Each structure stands twice: as structure tokens, then as C-alpha cells.
């Protein structure tokens, strides 16, 4: 018996999530999918746009077998603590074989390499990070520069010394995926990470009419009272949600 875990907000649950669950069962041959989901409040302390029971119902109707609530303390925290809490929960359950997550880059070796450095924080990496922070750079920019500095000393990692490193650390799902990998390492978990390449709309794409619509487009449409304009030039009405959400 194989069981895959997913850590998610599902704010809201949409076609991209339904695709992910179906893809997981197809690729891992998993018998069950268990979800650790945020409750009525999500990251940054914002209320979810639909209640936890409705989001759980949608996940179950699209192939998930069990939905557990991630405690609000961690659901509202940063990506690091959000990921750590979900990984700790699945690790203590003792029955999860795979941890699946979406990523803009599904190259596990590259994601693992970065996660390992960020988890171990070698002295030369720490020194470089402190230098860039003292120069006034914000933390994400300083972290990218510190990683480049650290990797430049390792000829075996030349492939990560280009713009690809910036790309890996500038997209939301890659960032969260790296946090999952960090948490697996620090917890000493035996769970196997399994990234799935994101398809359809990018996270920051505001076109709600795309096939696999993602949370950002839906949330932006709600915030703008349905007035955001799609790439086709027409303003979508709320009927388009029927195509974006199960």
C-alpha cells in the first residue's frame, strides 16, 4: 500500500489541485492521498475565501482520501514554518510514502542541492549572507547572492551558477518546495519528496479563463469584484468560476 501526502491551503481549491491529485495517483501508483490543509485562516493571517469544510469537501470529491487540518499557528506562519509543520505531521503519522508538491521546476536534484545548503547553512554561506544583508539588500535577494557566492567555489555545481538559480528562488512554488525539502532533512524524515511540474497558468497569471486556473488569478478577480481583464480582452464574469473550480 502506498500513501502520498500533500500540504496545502486550497485557497480556493481549483482545477490545478484536481490535476495534481490525479497526477499523483497516476505517477506514484498511490492507493491513498492524504492532505494536511490550512483551516479557516491561511498565510499572512488572512481568512480563507471559503470555509475549511467546503474546501475539504471539494478535495475529497476530486480524489483525496483524507483531509487533516493544519493548526492555525502554522497555517498563518511563513513558508518555512508552514512547511515544517506539515512535514512533521506526516512524519509522525508513520504511514506516508511520498510528499508531493507542485513546482515551476521539477528537477529534484537542483531543488535538493539548494535545500541542503539552506538547511546546513555552511559558514561561508552565512558569511556571504550577512555581508549582503549589511549592504542593505532584502533577504530574498541576499540569499540568492549568498548561494551564488557559495556555489561559485564548487566547480561541480556550475550548472547552478546562472540565472537558473535566480529563477529557482523567485517562484512561489519552488520556494515552498525547497522549504519542504529542508524540513524533510531537518526532521530526518524517510518520506520521499515527489515534485510535479506545474501546468497551465503561472501563479501570478491573472487570466482566469486558462485551463488550469490557479489561486492568484481567482483571488485577484474576487478582490477586483470581477473586473480584472483576461488576455482575450474581455472582463470575466463570475460564471467563469464554474470552469476554474470543480
Describe each region flagged by the PLM.
Residues 8, 42-43, 59, 73-74, ...:
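Short, contiguous strand/loop micro-motifs
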Residues 50-54, 62, 77, 81, ...:
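Generic alpha-helix structural propensity
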Residues 31, 65, 97:
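Receiver (REC) domain switch/active-site residues of two-component response regulators
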Residues 1-55:
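N-terminal catalytic cores of NTP/NDP-binding nucleotidyl/phosphoryl-transfer enzymes
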Residues 25-26, 60, 87, 91-92:
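Non-catalytic positions within long, well-ordered alpha-helices that form the structural scaffold/packing
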Residues 56-71:
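A glycine-rich helix N-cap at a beta->alpha junction
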